[in-house]
Structure formats: structure tokens, C-alpha cells
A protein has these predicted regions:
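Helix-boundary/low-complexity linker signature
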Residues: 1, 25-26, 36-39
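Polar helix-capping/helix-linker motif
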Residues: 162, 187, 212-216
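A short secondary-structure junction signal
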Residues: 146-147, 190-195, 208-209
């Protein structure tokens, strides 16, 4: 058993719609993508960074394929913007894409909440689905009973609340339980992890409501887990690099894509 080996111990959120496509509703009478450059109808499209290589060839194909609407050529202009940043800029009116492809459907719901109006539809097609998981150093996972015993969010919450930390499992040298997740304001994995934490606190697997988030009991549970966060990284790659460089005691578990 290598102390440096990282294992996936639990699916945090079953699937993230990483290829989601939203056709955004405009607040004016434009009715859609009709910004003109010369004679062309320009369709402004914003995509999250992980899909740039997937969608760029499709954009080139459309732009070079002679697509027309109402007798005018159509040109797609694609901008690459992280989902969290795009959410903020759309709400602020800094960008008005006709098409938005964030890293998760959660961003569309958050956009509508922050804008206080339905800019993104409730249902949109998803091109790709990827899991969000909890990763742990293998010795830590085995100390919790993995793989014979399942490790879930309730396990992590209990460990975060424990005053004894890893000493309760015969490993005081590992120190307290330390959790890692990315910033939910900007990162998809961080946002998804926070939603999963509230679902666990509410005793649900899906169907999180605003009442669940506002419930004092659930907020206390999530707060206790968040207090164990060692660092809010910008990306999950940061945690992977730190775990490799600093060893297993840097963090006990990380929510990762």
C-alpha cells in the first residue's frame, strides 16, 4: 500500500452536465442572436474552458459551411470564459451571449437566482456528463473501513466534527480531519460539492430546495464540514499537485472532478 496513492472513495454528485448548452433569454426585444457585423448575423457563444477543444471545430465548421438565416450568412463567435466568471458577467450585463455552455446545469440555476429572472431554461441538452468524486489518500480511506465499508458525505461530516481526528483510528500523527474543495463562487466542483453537502445535511439524494439551504440545522452541518476546509483552491489540479508535493497529511479528502 503506497502512502502516496490516491483513491476515489465516493461519488459526491452523481453526474455533472459538463457539456450543457443554454439558449439564453434576452431582456430586450432582440429575440436572440442578431448582432450584425457587415451583412452577417453574429451569434455570440460563451463556453467553459474544458470544452474549447470540443466545440472550436464545430464553430469552424458552421462558420465555413455557408449557413444562412433570412438570406444572411451566420457567423458564430465563441468566447472561452469560466462558468463562475460568466455567471457574474451575464448578471452584470457585461456580456450577453445568445448561447452559453457552462460546466454544469447548476450555473444556469444560479444565474436565474442572481438575476432574479429566467435567463436560462430549466431543461437544456447535455453533451457530456462527468462525475464529481471524493478522493482520499489510500491509508486514510482504509482507516475508515474502505473498501469494505462505504464512505459517504455523512462519514466526512462526522470526521469533521470529531475532536479526536485521526487519533480515533490509531493515527494521531495524521492530525485532524482536513477537507479540500475549490471555491464554490467560481469553481464547478466547489459549487457541486457545496450542493452535495446540503443534500447530505437534509438527508436527501436530490431535489434540494431553498428551504433546505436556509434550515438552521442543515446550515450548521455544512458549516462544521466547511470549518475543516484547509484551503479553497482555484482548481482541483491545485489540490492534486499539493497532495503529490506535500504528502497525505496535507489534506484528508478532496472533492474532485
Amino acid at each position: 500500500m503506497s502512502p502516496g496513492r490516491i483513491v476515489t472513495v465516493v461519488a459526491a454528485v452523481a453526474l455533472i452536465g459538463a457539456g450543457l448548452v443554454f439558449a439564453l433569454t434576452r431582456g430586450d426585444d432582440s429575440g436572440g442572436p442578431d448582432g450584425a457585423s457587415g451583412d452577417a448575423i453574429v451569434v455570440d457563444m460563451v463556453v467553459s474552458p474544458e470544452k474549447e477543444r470540443l466545440l472550436a471545430p464545430l464553430v469552424d465548421e458552421i462558420n465555413g459551411g455557408g449557413v444562412e438565416a433570412a438570406g444572411r450568412p451566420v457567423r458564430v463567435e465563441m468566447a472561452v470564459v469560466s462558468s463562475g466568471e460568466a455567471t457574474e458577467r451575464i448578471v452584470a450585463g457585461e456580456i450577453e451571449p445568445a448561447i452559453w455552455s457552462p460546466a454544469s446545469s447548476l450555473w444556469g440555476r444560479l444565474l436565474n437566482y442572481r438575476a432574479d429572472r429566467a435567463l436560462a431554461p430549466d431543461e437544456s441538452p447535455s453533451l457530456v456528463k462527468t462525475p464529481l468524486v471524493i478522493a482520499m489518500p489510500e491509508p486514510f480511506a482504509r482507516a475508515l473501513g474502505w473498501p469494505d465499508e462505504p464512505i459517504g458525505w455523512s462519514t466526512l461530516i462526522a470526521e469533521a466534527r470529531s475532536e479526536r481526528g485521526w487519533a480515533a483510528y490509531g493515527h494521531p500523527e495524521w492530525g485532524p480531519f482536513k477537507f479540500g474543495q475549490t471555491n464554490p463562487e467560481f469553481s464547478t466542483s466547489g459549487l457541486s460539492a457545496t450542493v452535495a453537502e446540503y443534500l447530505a445535511a437534509a438527508g436527501k439524494r436530490e431535489g434540494l430546495t431553498l428551504a433546505d439551504v436556509r434550515a438552521p440545522k442543515n446550515r450548521r452541518v455544512v458549516r462544521d464540514l466547511q470549518r475543516s476546509v484547509v484551503h479553497y483552491g482555484d482548481t482541483t489540479l491545485f489540490f492534486a499537485e499539493q497532495m503529490a508535493a506535500r504528502g497525505p497529511t496535507y489534506v484528508s479528502a478532496v472533492a474532485m472532478e
